[in-house]
A protein has these predicted regions:
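C-terminal motif of bacterial Sec signal peptides marking the signal peptidase cleavage site
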Residues: 4-7
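Bacterial signal peptide processing site
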Residues: 9-11
């Protein structure tokens, strides 16, 4: 069960009061601004050292709800990072490198930082601990050029995963386009041209049928976590704004029906995504928040299972303590 410690009267106390020794700390602010983003990163107390990557979604189109350059630019500059992304497995504006570069420039990212499409020159395999479905994780080869990662995710819905947060950003996001296929097909195919005919059977029909994909995402996220744990580290940030039922990989997403919530960060990706899920599930369904469609999508796709699978595999814990800034 999630533990939430109220911050009333404790605005200046940045130290977590952990009520459960097994709980992870999640930092939270309602300030969705460049300054708020920097402050929540600093609250984590981990210095970005060496060659730093900030992993984002570059967004399928300007209609997508991806994180805008003006929001993330000051943080990226502060840590002297490259923005990193990989090509997509599905046909669209970002499957082919030349098209992806065009989208990156149109979306304004090259104006704020050096951008690296990590699978532009190939891919590599990194080990997984949870090998139930996938036996390795196929990531962009440029991942080896980085010592530290800030996983900067936009929390939203997703057509296949139910929702997308830092776990999806670490798994599908860091995977090459062939790696994305490998995860989506739960180990059945590695060629992005073979994606659609190898998806888990009946994945749209029941939450259970989508489980192989969900568990493969968890395994891939853990692989990336362990990779950077063996280097200088990795931290996780979820931005809860413009929350649509559709992912930023959708070029024509449904309009957001939920008010902006805030920014959350943690060293534990499982606890962080669980916190964000709890925020959405606990919202009142009223004139300010129409949560019905998003919650239905998450439940239909067995979306919440990813945090429990991650916990079972040792990636993190679903127990958390909140420190509000």
């Amino acid at each position: 069960m999630a533990i939430v410690l109220p911050s009333c009267g404790q605005k200046n106390n940045k130290k977590a009061q952990v009520a459960d020794e097994n709980a992870s700390v999640v930092y939270f602010t309602k300030d969705i601004s460049p300054d708020g983003l920097i402050k929540i990163y600093e609250a984590l107390g981990v210095e970005a050292k060496g060659r730093v990557a900030v992993k984002i979604s570059t967004g399928e189109s300007m209609l997508s709800n991806h994180l805008r350059p003006e929001l993330i630019g000051p943080l990226v500059k502060k840590v002297n990072a490259n923005l990193v992304e990989c090509n997509t497995a599905y046909a669209g504006n970002r499957q082919q490198t030349a098209d992806h570069w065009k989208a990156i420039e149109e979306h304004g990212y090259t104006a704020i930082a050096t951008v690296d499409i990590m699978d532009e020159e190939g891919e590599m395999k990194i080990p997984v601990k949870d090998d139930k479905w996938i036996k390795y994780d196929i990531v962009g080869s440029h991942l080896q050029n980085y010592d530290f990662m800030i996983n900067l995710a936009h929390f939203k819905g997703h057509a296949m995963g139910g929702f997308g947060g830092v776990l999806k950003n670490a798994s599908i996001g860091v995977a090459s386009r062939n790696g994305k296929t490998y995860i989506h097909t739960a180990g059945k195919a590695e060629d992005y041209n073979q994606l659609w005919q190898n998806l888990p059977e009946g994945w749209m029909n029941s939450p259970e049928n989508d489980t192989p994909f969900i568990e493969s995402m968890s395994a891939a996220a853990q692989a990336v976590h362990e990779y950077f744990k063996g280097r200088n580290g990795i931290v996780y940030i979820d931005v809860m704004n413009n929350i649509s039922i559709d992912c930023d990989c959708d070029g024509n997403p449904h309009e957001p029906t939920i008010q902006d919530i805030g920014i959350a960060a943690s060293l534990d990706p499982v606890a962080l995504d669980k916190f964000c899920l709890d925020q959405v599930f606990n919202l009142p369904n009223d004139e300010n928040n129409d949560t019905k469609a998003l919650l239905e999508r998450i439940n239909q796709r067995h979306g919440t299972h990813i945090v429990y699978r991650g916990e079972e595999a040792g990636l993190g814990t679903t127990k958390y303590t909140v420190v509000e800034l």
